[in-house]
C-alpha cells in the first residue's frame, strides 16, 4: 500500500518467501509491558539500536534463545539469565546427529561458551510459571529442574519457543497443506524442487518449514531453477543436485535440533483456565476449553468462529499455535487433527484512509 494507494501486480509465476514468526506459548502475566518475543527483542536491538530493558531475561527454548542473549550481552545489555525449558540431557542425546553439520554445531557451542565465559547464568529444564509486576514486569517466576520455585528480578523478558512458518500468503494462494510433526504445525506441501500444489507457485525459505538462513538461500535458488525449468529453460543439473543435497543435510540437522530443543508438549496441560491465550480478543484458555466442551468442537476454525480466538489484528500469528495445543489437549485428540487457522485477507492491517486504487497494468510478471 504505497502512499495510501492500493495496487495489484499481475503474475504468472511467483516465489513466495514469507519467512517465519516467533512461536509463542503464553504464561500468566505475558501481557505486561516489558514482555517481548525473542524475535521482537532481536529486532529492537538490530534495527533500532536499543535493548528491551535494563535487566533482561531470555526464556523459552531453541537456538534463537542463545543467539539473541549473546547479541544483547555483546552490545552491552545487562542479561540477567537465560532460562531454557529443554533439559541439558537433550543436548547430549542430539549431539551425534548434529555432528553432520560440524560448522553449524560449532557456532552454537561458541554462543553457549561465550555466555558461560562472561558469567551469564544459564538454567536448563526449567518451567516458566508467570511474569509478575504492577505497571510492567518486575520479576519472572520459574521452576528449576529440581522442581524448586525461583524468582528472577528483571525489567524485560524475551520469550520464545523456536519459530513457526509464516504461511498465510501461501494459504490465500490456494496451496495445499499437510501436518508436519517436525514443525508441530501444518505447512504448505512442496516437492523436492519447492513447487507447491498450485501451478506457478513456488515456496522458498522458512515459510515452507523452519530450516534456517542457509537453507533459505539454497531453497530460494532451487525454487528459481524450478521456475526456469517449468518455463522450458535449461538449468544446470549439477547445481540442482548440489542444492538438493545441501538441503537434505540441513534437514537432518534440523531433526537433531528438535531433539536438542524439544517442544514442551505438556504446556497445555499446565495452562490455567485464566491464562490469556489470544491477547487481541482477550480469549482465555478456560474459554477455549469451555467452548470446545459445550459445542463439541474439534477443529480450530470452528473454535475461532465461536469464541473469536485468532480474529484480532495478528490474525492468529501470535496465538494460533497455543490455541491449537489447548484444543488438542482439551479434546484428547492428536494435534494434527485440530487443523490450522486459515489465512484471511488482508493478511496485514490496512489503513482506513486509502485514497486511490491503481488498476493493474496489462502484463505478466
Can you name each region flagged by the protein language model?
Residues 1-307, 311-313, 317-326, 330-365:
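Residues forming the flavin
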Amino acid at each position: 500500500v504505497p502512499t495510501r494507494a492500493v495496487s495489484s501486480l499481475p503474475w504468472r509465476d511467483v516465489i513466495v518467501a514469507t519467512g517465519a514468526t516467533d512461536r509463542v506459548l503464553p504464561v500468566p502475566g505475558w501481557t505486561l509491558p516489558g514482555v517481548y518475543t525473542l524475535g521482537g527483542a532481536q529486532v529492537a536491538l538490530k534495527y533500532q539500536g536499543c535493548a528491551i530493558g535494563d535487566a533482561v531475561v531470555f526464556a523459552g527454548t531453541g537456538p534463537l534463545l542463545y543467539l539473541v542473549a549473546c547479541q544483547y550481552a555483546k552490545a552491552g545489555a545487562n542479561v540477567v539469565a537465560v532460562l531454557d525449558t529443554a533439559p541439558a540431557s537433550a543436548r547430549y542425546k542430539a549431539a551425534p546427529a548434529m555432528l553432520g553439520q560440524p560448522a553449524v554445531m560449532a557456532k552454537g557451542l561458541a554462543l553457549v561458551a561465550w555466555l558461560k565465559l562472561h558469567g551469564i547464568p544459564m538454567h536448563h529444564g526449567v518451567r516458566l510459571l508467570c511474569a509478575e509486576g504492577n505497571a510492567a514486569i518486575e520479576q519472572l517466576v520459574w521452576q528449576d529442574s529440581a522442581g524448586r520455585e525461583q524468582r528472577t528480578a528483571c525489567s524485560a523478558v524475551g520469550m520464545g519457543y523456536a519459530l513457526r512458518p509464516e504461511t498465510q500468503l501461501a494459504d490465500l494462494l490456494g496451496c495445499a497443506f499437510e501436518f508436519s510433526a517436525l514443525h508441530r504445525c501444518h505447512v504448505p506441501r512442496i516437492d523436492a524442487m519447492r513447487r507447491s500444489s498450485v501451478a506457478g507457485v513456488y515456496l522458498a525459505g522458512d515459510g515452507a518449514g523452519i530450516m534456517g538462513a542457509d537453507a533459505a538461500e539454497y531453497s530460494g535458488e532451487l525454487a528459481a531453477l524450478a521456475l526456469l525449468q517449468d518455463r522450458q529453460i535449461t538449468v544446470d543439473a549439477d547445481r540442482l543436485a548440489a542444492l538438493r543435497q545441501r538441503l537434505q543435510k540441513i534437514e537432518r540437522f534440523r531433526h537433531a535440533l528438535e531433539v536438542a530443543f524439544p517442544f514442551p508438549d505438556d504446556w497445555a496441560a499446565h495452562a490455567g483456565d485464566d491464562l490469556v491465550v489470544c491477547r487481541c480478543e482477550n480469549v482465555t484458555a478456560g474459554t477455549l476449553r469451555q467452548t470446545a466442551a459445550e459445542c463439541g468442537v474439534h477443529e480450530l476454525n470452528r473454535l475461532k468462529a465461536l469464541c473469536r480466538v485468532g480474529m484480532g489484528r495478528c490474525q492468529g500469528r501470535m496465538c494460533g499455535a497455543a490455541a491449537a495445543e489447548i484444543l488438542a489437549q482439551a479434546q484428547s485428540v492428536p494435534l494434527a487433527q485440530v487443523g490450522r487457522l486459515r489465512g484471511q485477507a488482508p493478511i496485514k492491517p490496512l489503513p482506513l484512509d486509502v485514497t486511490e486504487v491503481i488498476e493493474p497494468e496489462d502484463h505478466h510478471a
